[in-house]
Structures are given as C-alpha cells and as structure tokens.
Amino acid sequence: MKLIVGLGNPGNEYRFTRHNAGFLAIDKICEKLNISLNKEKFNGEFAVSDGFILAKPLTYMNKSGDFVYSIASFYKINPSDIIVIYDDLSFSIGQAAIKIGGSSAGHKGIERLMSKFSSNDFKRIRVGIGVNSGTTIKDYVLSLFTKDEMIVVEEVLEKVADAAISLVYNDVNFVMNKFNTDNKKRVI
C-alpha cells in the first residue's frame, strides 16, 4: 500500500494559494481517477483505492506531519512508500521534480514529517511556486497565483498527478528519469 499526500492549508481562503500546490495536486488526481476523499480520520481526509491511499491533512501546514504519521501508522505504510506533494520556492512556476530524501530546505511541513518519522526516506514531488520577490516568505506562500500563473500551474499539475500515480505502480528511478527530465526545464 502506498500513501499519496498533498500538503497545504485547509479552508477556502487558502485553496488557490502557492502553499496549497500539494492540495491542488491531490484535487487533480481525484479528478483524473474519479475519486473523492470520502473518509475523515486522524485530522485529515482521504480515500482508499486499489493499492494506494490519497490524502490531505486538515491541519495547517506546520502540523501536517501529525496526520501523515497517524494514517501511515494505522495502515502500516513505511516512509519509503509515502509520496508527498508540496510547494517549492526554489523552482519557478511550471517546474516540478521528484526527489527521494534530502533536507527539508526550510519547508515546515516537510520538517514536521521528517521529525515524526525520524526519517527522510519518503518520495517527494516538489511543485514550483516561483521565487519570492520582495515580500516575506509567509506572505508570498500565502499569496494567490495570478491568472497567468494558474494556467501554467494547471499544466504542471496534470503532469504531477500522472507522476504520482505512476510512482504507485512503477520503479521510482524510472518515473524520476521520465518526469524530472520533462519538467525541471519549464520556466514561466
């Protein structure tokens, strides 16, 4: 069993903010697979499908690791079988990449996951939200995408959704080679 989890903040006021790239990716996967997150437990919402669980924490970003740890423990999912989709300030909008392990790079949601699991062994799909220009990081990640940015974000989320689904059924190196080559080059 694999766990695909998107990080973000709950509530409509955050729905289309940069920090909710992970939630937007989960929405895209649900749309592609005609799945709805129909279970609520562990302070999150999720759906159990054939071979994987699709999930969103209902906590704020900085506490999202609590939900991920609880659901993974309940379903006996190892960190190496977790796929986390989240926003990344170091990538331009339209860029995305799969990564295994590494540091949190200051991302509070990833820091919490690493702390809860005492591991960084999970797979990550990093979705570019653009480089902060002249505002605080908090204000930037909580800002809305512009209309033009959202068009590009929608395009990359299609590929992110396909990559996440592919990671459930295929070798991570195969998926990384295919996805990372295509998506790290794109710049808005």
Swiss-Prot record:
GO biological process, alphabetically ordered: protein quality control for misfolded or incompletely synthesized proteins; rescue of stalled ribosome
Q: What parts of the sequence cross the membrane?
A: none
Q: Where does tRNA bind?
A: Y14, Y60, N62
Q: At which residues is there a site annotated Stabilizes the basic form of H active site to accept a proton?
A: D87
UniProt entry tagged with the keyword RNA-binding: yes
Indicate the quaternary assembly.
Monomer.
Provide GO CC annotations from the record.
cytoplasm
CDD domains named among the record's database cross-references = PTH
Q: Which domain of life is it from?
A: Bacteria
Q: Where in the cell is it found?
A: Cytoplasm
What is this protein called in UniProt? Peptidyl-tRNA hydrolase
> Mind telling me which PANTHER family this protein's record contains?
PEPTIDYL-TRNA HYDROLASE
Active site, per annotation: H19 (proton acceptor)
Reaction it catalyzes = an N-acyl-L-alpha-aminoacyl-tRNA + H2O = an N-acyl-L-amino acid + a tRNA + H(+)
Which terms are listed as keywords in the entry?
A: Cytoplasm, Hydrolase, RNA-binding, tRNA-binding
Annotated positions for site Discriminates between blocked and unblocked aminoacyl-tRNA: N9
Q: Which organism is it from?
A: Mycoplasmopsis agalactiae (strain NCTC 10123 / CIP 59.7 / PG2) (Mycoplasma agalactiae)
Tell me any Pfam family this protein matches: Pept_tRNA_hydro
Instruction: Please describe what this protein does.
Output: Hydrolyzes ribosome-free peptidyl-tRNAs (with 1 or more amino acids incorporated), which drop off the ribosome during protein synthesis, or as a result of ribosome stalling. Catalyzes the release of premature peptidyl moieties from peptidyl-tRNA molecules trapped in stalled 50S ribosomal subunits, and thus maintains levels of free tRNAs and 50S ribosomes.
The record's section on HAMAP family has:
Pept_tRNA_hydro_bact (MF_00083)
Q: Which family does it belong to?
A: Belongs to the PTH family.
